[in-house]
């Protein structure tokens, strides 16, 4: 299909003089799909695979040239637990499939022997079902998996606008090396951007993370004395930070271009300093990989039909679409309500990953890889089934998820 539609788009650019430029742009619609997934992190990978396995024609749009998001390009390479810390696995389906894929050819650290080898049930109470994986191997294997499942991947592509037909997204406007084009959406859109970018562009209600983000500068190095090692410079999150981990008192929203550029430069400075300090002790020490995206954790999320809080562990929800644990402690298990994945404003938009509808206190629990994968599978499956998420019979969705190995309730 190749057709053209004239879209009148106004852009305001505010330099020092506060001038504005009004542009009238004719944007060609060059492609179409049933389900468009925006963002190729763990949530986007899960959503695209699940939608395609349900028979949908799926296009995944990713701004970088590598899949995995923070879990690869961001060097946050710890697949946090699929278990409750008490010896019981709670997250299944694609969450477990991607876990096993990440270490198909070996783990870097924390290999969960008790979970991957038989006869270790007692040891599972002492060892969590988590692992440190190689980011490059995972990115390559994930790409292969998506292609095998018939997903079309557009790398180097940013979503810059949407076209609406009433309360539904009819086309997604993208920019890449081909210029500015539109992709017609025949059914639904899954926002896996991590920042609720599609929700924001489409006019859906969103909320920002009030505490903002701290600076991290994780990177990989190799040396004769230590071999390959992950340097977790700076605190990874506010929940477990120690005073000595805090690199700067400045906090970052993750939603401002200038701020993100400054944050990246600060992170690079700390990485370089860490490298040079290590080289003083071992001249063979050299960097292997540094993050190519900002190591931002929590920014903006949708204001969904329902918002879940961290106090609701072990609570049963009639619209549960999966289970996940609190990676920070042993015991708590949560059901994921389907109503946290979509809002009231845009009928055919659903979210997965760290931009689902949760309180600030809950955000640190739900932003991690297992929850991204669980929510991604639910969102992608639903996206293949409907163009109006509020009207989708939850029993129909739950039947498909259960058939695919997802556990809905404790």
What annotation goes with each model-predicted range?
Residues 2-35:
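Extreme N-terminal leader/targeting segments of oxidoreductases
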Residues 29, 54, 64, 342-344:
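Extracellular/periplasmic catalytic domains that process cell-envelope and extracellular macromolecules
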Residues 26, 70-72, 94, 98, ...:
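Flavin (FAD/FMN)-binding glycine-rich loop and adjacent Rossmann-like elements that form
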Residues 29, 33, 43-44, 182:
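Ligand-binding pocket scaffold of soluble enzyme catalytic domains
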Residues 15-17, 24, 56-57, 63-161, ...:
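Conserved N-terminal/central alpha/beta ligand/cofactor-binding core
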Residues 38-40, 61-64, 192-194, 354-355:
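Active-site-proximal beta-strand/loop segments in catalytic clefts of secreted hydrolases
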Residues 35-56:
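N-terminal Rossmann-like FAD-binding beta1-loop-alpha1 element of flavoenzymes
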């Amino acid at each position: 299909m190749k057709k053209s539609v004239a879209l009148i788009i106004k852009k305001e650019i505010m330099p020092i003089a506060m001038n504005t430029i009004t542009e009238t742009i004719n944007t060609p619609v060059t492609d179409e799909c049933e389900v468009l997934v925006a963002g190729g992190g763990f949530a986007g990978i899960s959503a695209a695979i699940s939608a395609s396995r349900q028979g949908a024609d799926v296009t995944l749009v990713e701004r970088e040239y590598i899949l995995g998001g923070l879990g690869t390009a961001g060097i946050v390479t710890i697949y946090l637990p699929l278990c409750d810390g008490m010896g019981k696995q709670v997250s299944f389906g694609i969450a477990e499939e991607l876990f096993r894929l990440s270490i198909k050819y070996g783990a870097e650290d924390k290999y969960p022997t008790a979970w991957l080898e038989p006869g270790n049930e007692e040891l599972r109470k002492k060892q969590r079902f988590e692992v440190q994986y190689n980011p490059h191997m995972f990115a390559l294997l994930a790409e292969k998996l998506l292609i095998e499942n018939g997903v079309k991947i557009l790398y180097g592509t940013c979503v810059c606008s949407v076209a609406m037909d009433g309360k539904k997204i009819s086309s997604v406007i993208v920019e890449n090396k081909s210029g500015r084009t539109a992709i017609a959406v025949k059914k639904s859109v899954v926002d896996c951007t991590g920042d609720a970018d599609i929700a924001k562009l489409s006019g859906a209600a969103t909320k920002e993370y009030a505490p903002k983000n701290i600076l991290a500068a994780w990177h990989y190095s190799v040396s004769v004395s230590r071999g390959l090692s992950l340097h977790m410079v700076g605190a990874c999150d506010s929940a477990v930070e120690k005073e000595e981990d805090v690199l700067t008192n400045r906090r970052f929203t993750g939603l401002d271009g200038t701020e993100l550029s400054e944050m990246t430069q600060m992170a690079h400075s700390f990485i370089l300093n860490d490298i040079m300090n290590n080289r003083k002790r071992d001249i063979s020490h050299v960097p292997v990989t540094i993050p190519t995206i900002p190591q931002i954790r929590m920014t903006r999320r949708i204001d969904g039909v329902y918002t879940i809080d961290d106090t609701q562990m072990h609570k049963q929800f009639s619209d549960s679409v999966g289970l996940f644990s609190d990676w920070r402690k042993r015991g708590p298990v949560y059901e994921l309500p389907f109503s946290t994945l979509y809002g009231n404003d845009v009928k055919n938009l659903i979210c997965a990953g760290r931009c689902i509808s949760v309180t600030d206190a809950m955000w640190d629990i739900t932003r991690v890889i297992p929850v991204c994968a669980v929510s991604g599978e639910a969102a992608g499956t639903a996206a293949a089934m409907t163009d109006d998420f509020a009207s989708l019979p939850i029993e129909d969705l739950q039947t498909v998820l259960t058939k695919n190995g997802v556990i809905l309730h404790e």
